[in-house]
């Protein structure tokens, strides 16, 4: 996407600067910035929250910490920032998330869960896509169910954008010459139909047949087979 050439620290710092400007914040009053970040290595490593604080020219007393809970990283960061305020530990904390899947690809940080054969075997490890299809099978979500929800979601997103419901939540990403790089979500496809989605092949069927289906069924023996219902049109995308 359009953001593939923008370093993640720049994405984060642009948001912090906009937050300061829009809310007339005296950054000296901010106690902490908590940012969720999957695979906090390379350009996203070395505590990207604190790095973004420095790049944003916020007050030097503002601390920063990064959190990695995979897909829930940003939400977890917001929860932590809120908990700091609720507990009285902080008067003002900022919570959010940043990541560039184009620049720091999925799986970059490795880890024993999938790389160590003993750990993978003992934990019945399967890739996330297989897990998604497993859950759909276990809880009776058919291909029609997930495709119809995707169609509805695309239309809702487009209508919300047209109604400017996100105008106070989104800023354009601009380059060093103040020229726009991205101003609108590229992932919205309001023209999506059940027919167009029906032409897409399941993304994880071949992977499942390679052996991961058997691993999943070992863990969930109540299932006789895994129905592969997810594909690029009804799943989250790499949106940077």
Where are these regions (language model features)?
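Glycine-rich nucleotide phosphate-binding loop and flanking beta-alpha elements
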Residues: 41, 100-102, 157, 237
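Conserved catalytic cysteine-centered active-site region
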Residues: 6, 37-91, 111, 123-130, ...
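Conserved active-site "lid/cap" helical segment
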Residues: 1-56, 63, 71, 134-143, ...
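Short acidic, glycine/serine/threonine-rich loops at helix termini
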Residues: 1, 45-46, 103-109, 186
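N-terminal extracellular/periplasmic Venus flytrap/periplasmic-binding protein-like
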Residues: 4-14, 22, 148-239
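Active-site-proximal alpha-helical scaffold in enzymes
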Residues: 67-98, 136-166
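Flexible glycine-/small-residue-enriched beta->alpha junction loops
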Residues: 86-139
